[in-house]
From Swiss-Prot:
Belongs to the mandelate racemase/muconate lactonizing enzyme family. RhamD subfamily. It catalyses: L-rhamnonate = 2-dehydro-3-deoxy-L-rhamnonate + H2O. SMART domains: MR_MLE. GO terms for biological process: amino acid catabolic process; carbohydrate catabolic process. The gene is rhmD. It holds the Pfam family MR_MLE_N. GO terms for molecular function: L-rhamnonate dehydratase activity; magnesium ion binding. This is L-rhamnonate dehydratase. The record marks E345 as: Transition state stabilizer. It is an enzyme of class 4 (lyase). Signal peptide: none annotated.
Length: 401
């Protein structure tokens, strides 16, 4: 089979600070009012009173959704979405395009390595540039799968299990239990600036959900980089009587020594997890050496599927689990091939967590959601990632080449 070359790459955005508010999509923090994900949730900015009531107050939704589409010579297209918005469009159209166009659709690793090397001087170890590279990488995998007529998970070697089971992230673990999920992860609402009173309030929230959900349902806390080691350790011990399964991302990404100390001092049987805001394989190698129990890369932020596969192999060599952060179909096709990912995350994007809404709604068409907390591998059997771009969204292409 002669594979075509890539003819063109294009980049659009929706939402963010320069477009309509509440667009959702790849930037799932960009929601309308009265939504749990934009509510009073602890963040690194919560110590400032002007920015503690809502995550949107400090600008969590300013980037918007980046959409990257790659087109082959035969007219077939692949696409992906992430969080990078208009600035990501500039990086794709004015810099990364030279490494993509003219390459064979199977040259994914070559393109990936060239994108990393060419942006190293302004990308650091993550953030906006890595989100953009991730989006391009995912679009390339989608195109390759569509050209050869295979789902991405089969390109990775095939499924190691028949279905993916999920826990749900949202404000209502009790509703998640009714929907068939294996666990529920809640955001914390208080931080070090709130002192012991904040610890008592979040521990009381866990206690309340334990009473509602019963003794066996998993409960976890997502701390979103908002704590220090001392506070996180106290919170973990305060929640231990309520059988908290893990405490997540308590510290900023680069505080590796802090994670090592937290893991050492956490209650017996409680896991320590992180990785959502780490980018590059190298940062995950350092994170793995802290001894945390689960690494949680976001495939749309860490360097794409190409990097996620490398992270999973690294974790496996150290006996650690990899449970990616959200990411819907882009994670599904990966984790069903990983032997060290026994479950996955589903992010509840309905405002009150009472219904199942696709994570990247409305930008993806045919995006699956779990049924009774599970997705069978047969749901993933369409070529590529199995979804299509909703071109009825207000796509904006600010740059071209």
């Amino acid at each position: 089979m002669t594979l075509p070359k890539i003819k063109h790459v294009r980049a659009w955005f929706i939402g963010g600070a320069t477009a309509e508010k509440g667009a959702g999509g790849g930037d799932y923090h960009d929601q309308g009012g009265n939504h749990w994900i934009a509510d009073h949730i602890a963040t690194p900015m919560s110590k400032y009173r002007d920015y503690e009531q809502s995550r949107q107050s400090f600008g969590i939704n300013v980037l918007g959704t980046l959409i990257v589409e790659v087109e082959a010579e035969n007219g077939q297209t692949g696409f992906a979405v992430s969080t990078a918005g208009e600035m990501g469009c500039f990086i794709v159209e004015k810099h990364l395009n030279r490494f993509i166009e003219g390459k064979c659709v199977s040259d994914i690793k070559l393109i990936h390595d060239q994108m990393l090397g060419a942006t190293m001087y302004y990308s650091g170890s993550g953030g906006l540039v890595m989100n953009t590279i991730s989006c391009v990488d995912l679009a390339l995998w989608d195109l390759f799968g569509k050209v050869v007529g295979l789902p991405v998970y089969k390109l990775l070697g095939g499924a190691v299990r028949d279905e993916i089971q999920f826990y749900a992230t949202g404000a209502r673990p009790d509703l998640a239990k009714e929907m068939g999920f294996i666990g529920g992860k809640m955001p914390t609402h208080w931080g070090p600036h709130d002192g012991d009173a904040g610890i008592r309030k979040d521990a009381a929230m866990v206690a309340d959900m334990r009473e509602k959900c019963g003794p066996d349902f998993w409960l976890m806390l997502d701390c979103w980089m908002s704590q220090d080691v001392n506070y996180a350790t106290k919170l973990a011990h305060a929640c231990a009587p309520f059988n908290l399964k893990w405490i997540e991302e308590c510290l900023p990404p680069q505080q590796y020594e802090g994670y090592r100390e937290l893991k050492r001092n956490a209650p017996a049987g409680m896991m320590v997890t992180s990785g959502e805001h780490h980018g590059t394989l190298q940062s995950f190698r350092t994170l793995s050496e802290t001894g945390i129990d689960i690494m949680q890369p976001d495939v749309g932020w860490c360097g794409g599927l190409t990097t996620l596969v490398e992270i999973a192999a690294l974790a496996k060599s150290r006996g650690q689990l990899v449970v990616p952060h959200g990411s819907s179909v882009y994670s599904h096709h990966a984790v069903i091939t990983f032997t060290n990912t026994p479950f996955s995350e589903f992010l509840m994007t309905s405002p009150d967590c009472s219904t199942l809404r696709p994570q990247f709604d409305p930008i993806l068409l045919d995006e699956p959601v779990p049924v009774n907390g599970r997705i069978h591998k047969s749901v993933l059997d369409k070529p590529g990632f199995g979804v299509e771009l909703n071109r009825d969204c207000h796509l904006k292409r600010p740059y071209s080449h």
